[in-house]
Amino acid sequence: MLRKSVLELSSRLSIKRFPRNLGAQRFHLSSSRNASTSGKNGLPGAKPVGKPDASKVDPPKVTPPPPTKGNSSKVVIGGVAIAGAFLVAYQTGYLDQYLGKEQQKLSERIHSDALTEKLEEAHHLNVPSGVEDSTEKDGKVETQPQVTHSEASEGVQSDIELQPESDLSSDRFTYISSNQEETPQETVIDRAEINLPISASEDSGAKPDMPSEIISEAESVKLEAVPKPGDSPIIVNAQSSSVHRESETESASPKDPAALKTPEDGIEREVQLPGSLLKEYNLEGSDTESTGSSSIGEQITKETEAFPNSTEGLKDSYMTEDGKLVLDFLAAIHAAEKQQAHLDAQVFAEELRALKEKYENELRDLRARELMRIEEAAILDKELKRERTKAAAAIKAIQERMEDKLKAELEQKETEAQLALSKAEELAKAEMISTIAKEKAAQIEKMAEADLNIKALSMAFYARSEEARQSHSVHKLALGALALDDTLSKGLPVQKEIDTLQTYLEGTHKDSILGLVLSSLPEEARSNGTDTVLQLNQKFDTLKGTLRHFSLIPPGGGGILAHSLAHVASSLKFKEVDQANGGIESVIKKVDNYLAEGKLAEAAATLEEGVKGSKAEEIVSDWVRRARNRAITEQALTLLQSYATCVSLT
């Protein structure tokens, strides 16, 4: 993963840009050193370089050393040896105190452009041309801009300021040269002083509970390898092999530096961590430039002398500043990854909050619409109940009015009948009295003719009495016929009226045909009544659609397809020119005509004959039966009225 990150950083180097306040403050250093071909190395000596001109931005031209086979082999062997010594020292816990110092106090982000450029310059200046091709493939480094936790939470931006070139003194730069004067070699120490505005809370380490990867940043870069006395000078660059090994070692080790310390490192546990990496690398700004350069030399001397005194043979290795650079660079990469994840989480939370607000607004709108629809439904329900109440009240009022009207008519008819009966009785009584008086007078006058006259009067009396009785029975028969007609017009049961008529016929018309007619009335009409002509018309209109549908289905029934085709065919209406073809529409037309003429029996017979042999025969059977009952009852009523009329005339 580290190799992938290094390659990505290298590929993004071309699109990076320098901040506006750092564009004119980049500085480049070059130096040369002379060495003889004898192969003996002297102690490292610093050669001061004059201050670079502030007005000139372009770096001075540097003549690269001639590529030699021996030089390349020395660089490769020295790099491998330093990397192995560094790994051994790291695994044994010798570097814990330095790692703890580096990872605890870093709180601001590293400037990616400055770090990348310094690595490239050191790479091109220190690596010979023979080795440069192999190191360029794996040594490309790029760092992404990072934002610390304090900047993400508080929105504070920290600017990285470099010292102007005019303020840099020659004491800031040291060079390693050998005592050999015949073979020229060159090494470059590129140092940059970075001033970071850090708050007091960050300087004092106010957040110990935060991971060191989040708050750590690399603040300085030192590309100088200090050789051990007696060895040839070796320039160590940020090569891909050492970086890869160190990254694997760091990933395999625990994150907490204190956990790496062994019981044997009792002295190292007592060492206090410095305030920041700037103080450790002597890169923090001071009042005087001379004191800074002297402290750099002392620090290098102490570090050089500390390495030979490390525990056992494996710890006797080079602890160069390049190792710290790699660790700082790895810590910066981890911090960038952590910070990028933190920023992604913030962006995701913001988008989630926006979506939540959007859906909450939509939910509120939907709830408001739902409440409006509920209110509308309640209003419509109230109106419907009110209309139902009005309709029920109107129906009840009409029923009461019709019942009152019927009662009034019945009372009027009974009163008229009673008056007519009383008049007839009075007339009969008067005639009887007069007849008796005449007979008595005739008996007094003619005793001889008394017996004859009495018989004649008796015969006349009996004749008139029979006439009066017959007249009275005819009146009762007419009243019964009227009552039967009224009951049939309402569709009510006629059993009561039939019983009354049979009572009237028992005394005078025992042998008449009326008894047979009344006994032939259907039992359903007597007990339940018959439908009126209007009701029969309404029921037939209701049956028309069903009649059209079931007339196309055989008596045994059909499946879903038969019913579907019958439904479609029944919905299509065609005007039939010839009504004698026996189609369902012609049958319906004939029945309508018969109903309009009042011929119920013919209508029932026509309908029954028209739907015979189809499924509709079962549907119309009830209507045909009711129509025939009505027809029979009306025929009996017509016969009764005709008989009463004939009797009254004779």
Swiss-Prot record:
Residue span of the annotated presequence: 1-34
Location of region: Disordered: 26-74, 121-168, 239-267, 284-304
Stretches assigned to coiled coil: 345-369, 396-430
Disruption phenotype: Altered mitochondria morphology leading to the presence of several big mitochondria with a round shape. Altered lipid homeostasis; reduced levels of digalactosyldiacylglycerol (DGDG) in the mitochondrial transmembrane lipoprotein (MTL) complex during phosphate (Pi) starvation, associated with the accumulation of phosphatidylethanolamine (PE) in mitochondrion.
Molecular functions per Gene Ontology: cardiolipin binding
Keyword tags: Coiled coil, Lipid transport, Lipid-binding, Membrane, Mitochondrion, Mitochondrion inner membrane, Transit peptide, Transmembrane, Transmembrane helix, Transport
Biased composition (Low complexity): 284-299
GO biological process: cellular response to phosphate starvation; lipid transport; regulation of lipid transport; regulation of membrane lipid distribution
Side of membrane Mitochondrial matrix, spans: 35-74, 571-650
Subunit structure and binding partners: Component of the mitochondrial contact site and cristae organizing system (MICOS) complex. The MICOS complex associates with mitochondrial outer membrane proteins. Present in a large lipid-enriched complex called mitochondrial transmembrane lipoprotein (MTL) complex made of proteins located in the two mitochondrial membranes, including the TOM complex and the core components of the MICOS complex and containing at least digalactosyldiacylglycerol (DGDG). Binds to TOM40-1.
PANTHER family: MICOS COMPLEX SUBUNIT MIC60, MITOFILIN
Physiological role: Component of the MICOS complex, a large protein complex of the mitochondrial inner membrane that plays crucial roles in the maintenance of crista junctions, inner membrane architecture, and formation of contact sites to the outer membrane. Plays a role in keeping cristae membranes connected to the inner boundary membrane. Also promotes protein import via the mitochondrial intermembrane space assembly (MIA) pathway. Involved in the maintenance of mitochondria morphology. Binds to glycerolipids such as cardiolipin (CL).
Family, per entry: Belongs to the MICOS complex subunit Mic60 family.
Protein known as: MICOS complex subunit MIC60, mitochondrial
Organism annotation: Arabidopsis thaliana (Mouse-ear cress)
Organism placement in taxonomy: Eukaryota, Viridiplantae, Streptophyta, Embryophyta, Tracheophyta
